């Protein structure tokens, strides 16, 4: 089904829902649930939080569908709701997305512009791919520090290793990560 057909079918389902057919909204949820959930997981990287965000997205859509003007596709509208919920979650929980730069992490862009969000997601995908190539002891330390936001001491406690070892693993792991990312980017700037 192409986008025009999907849009036409979405419009019909919306009209049926607005006329009182609850099953029409259920059909919309079935159609978009996996895509919205996948988007939420990519942004927040926490399965339970992504599930909550997905459910909240559809709850908000259910309540606001009478005001949906149709200026954009239904999926674009759901996408925007999802991104806003994800950004709110990230702000609320002070979670940060890892970068390969010298700073520990940088927050997701505050703008909900889809192009900016997609660029951030692509950068995160590239970083995660590079992280996956690291030896396990470096990978675990970097994930716990940069993706989970744990302190060096908390990581040392979890891994039952000295604090200095945690710092060394993260430092050396980041060097390897930068080298891997440069290779991925054909020696482009980081």
Q: Where in this protein do the model-derived segments appear?
A:
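Helix-turn-helix DNA-binding module
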Residues: 128-165, 179
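Arg/Lys-rich amphipathic alpha helix in sigma70-family domain 2
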Residues: 66-70, 80-100, 120, 172
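Structural recognition of an alpha-helix C-terminal capping motif at a helix-to-coil junction
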Residues: 52-59, 72-84
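Short helix-capping/turn signature of helix-turn-helix
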Residues: 31-34, 42-45, 143-153
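Short, charged helix-capping/linker segments at alpha-helix termini
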Residues: 2-4, 18-27, 37-56, 163, ...
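Sigma70-family region 2
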Residues: 18-19, 45, 58-73, 92-93
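Internal acidic/polar
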Residues: 2-10, 95-123, 151
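Short, Lys/Arg-enriched C-terminal cap helix and immediately downstream tail that follows
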Residues: 69, 91-94, 139, 174-190
């Amino acid at each position: 089904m192409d986008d025009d057909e999907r849009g036409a079918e979405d419009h019909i389902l919306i009209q049926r829902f607005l006329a009182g057919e609850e099953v029409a909204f259920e059909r919309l949820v079935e159609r978009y649930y996996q895509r919205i959930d996948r988007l939420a997981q990519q942004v927040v990287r926490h399965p339970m939080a992504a599930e909550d965000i997905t459910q909240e997205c559809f709850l908000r859509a259910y309540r606001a569908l009478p005001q949906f003007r149709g200026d954009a596709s239904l999926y674009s509208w759901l996408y925007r709701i999802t991104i806003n919920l994800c950004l709110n979650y990230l702000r609320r929980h002070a979670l940060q997305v890892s970068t390969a730069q010298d700073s520990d992490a940088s927050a997701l862009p505050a703008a909900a512009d889809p192009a900016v969000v997609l660029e951030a997601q692509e950068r995160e995908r590239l970083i995660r791919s590079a992280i996956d190539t690291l030896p396990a002891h470096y990978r675990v330390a970097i994930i716990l520090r940069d993706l989970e936001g744990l302190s060096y001491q908390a990581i040392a406690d979890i891994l039952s290793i000295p604090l200095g070892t945690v710092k060394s693993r993260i430092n050396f792991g980041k060097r390897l990560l930068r080298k891997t990312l440069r290779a991925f980017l054909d020696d482009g700037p980081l």
